Amino acid sequence: MADVVVGIQWGDEGKGKIVDRIAKDYDFVVRYQGGHNAGHTIVHKGVKHSLHLMPSGVLYSQCKNIISSAVVVSVKDLCEEISMFENLENRLFVSDRAHVILPYHVQKDAFKEKSQNIGTTKKGIGPCYEDKMARSGIRMGDLLDDRILEEKLKVHFKAIEPFKEAYDLNETYEKDLREYFEQYAPKIRPFIKDTTSMLIEANQKGEKILLEGAQGTLLDIDLGTYPFVTSSNTTSASACVSTGLNPKAINEIIGITKAYSTRVGNGPFPSEDTTPMGDHLRIGGAEFGTTTKRPRRCGWLDLVALKYACALNGCTQLALMKLDVLDGINEIKVCVAYERRGEKLETFPSDLKDCVPIYQTFKGWEKSVGVRKLDDLEQNTREYIRFIEEEVGVKIRLISTSPEREDTIFL
């Protein structure tokens, strides 16, 4: 059986810590979408690990780690992450169906961002997915055979010829790209496998599989705050599509949310706090992007968005992250509805323009940092947790009270 860990905000919810915390109970940890535009930070034995492509189970020797077919892969960045760890042979597997990000994709991404101003990381993620959908991309499996790779490169060079000048590709681009693959393909080849068959077989054998999403539900290309979204499907449903596991293989769906809200980049954010309180949350929560180092926009928990995300994913339980960041705040706000042009909205609309948050205020608490038992939390803290559970209709089974792995309350 497989369990899914999915972010139910705009990403950066703390999925890495949760996967790292529970990975010891699984045989496989699988990253199922996105690219190195996403980052997750794991603190293990006091050491901070910032990962972008590598599944979070890499710190557990018994875990097999898979990068599955809907992930887009920068082979250069993956090689750099591989070099951070030892003994990854037979522990890391990259789907032969996953698509490869090319330098051209990065150039195109930067060019488009100048005019669209979506707030992308300019890592080439979107253009790589574009080529995938146009059925013209290069896949990881193509790197296993030099002849096939050369054929794919010739098609690629022909396709981009009209755009070389626009995307600032120099005269040596073809030579440089061939040298790029000559450098990195041999390092990656030992890890490229048919992960779809591997996971189907593992599921049939009853092995435990943890499916790890990137970004968050509200950045989903179809169901998020379009056009300020990522280029992949970020909901739990995409875990099946990417891995080849059928929906009946899914057991628990664990939704990850912070005790407040953040967003990086542009796009609507109704509960954003632009007063010094927003700065307080940013500093207290160390809210700076793992990938871009950009400061995240911060605000109060948005239950309208949270209920929407839980419904989309079919969450069976929640993990509440960074509760300790709210320590010492006298009054804590929660967005319970929106007002838009005189109308009260309790459901999440496709367009958040003109949506103003309606808040409910709670008394704050002194301290929760480092607490590992529910009974040790102050009454006001427990009331805040209970309110979230009741409003969303999903039980909170895990609460994080610091970045450290052990500072976790299991319910």
UniProtKB/Swiss-Prot annotation:
The name this protein goes by in its record: Adenylosuccinate synthetase
Family affiliation: Belongs to the adenylosuccinate synthetase family.
Organism: Helicobacter acinonychis (strain Sheeba)
One biological process term in Gene Ontology: 'de novo' AMP biosynthetic process
A molecular function (GO) term: adenylosuccinate synthase activity
Cofactor note: Binds 1 Mg(2+) ion per subunit.
Residues that coordinate or bind substrate: T290, T291, T292, K293, R294, P295, R296
Record: residues binding GTP: 11-17, 39-41, 296, 322-324, 400-402
Residues at the active site: D12, H40
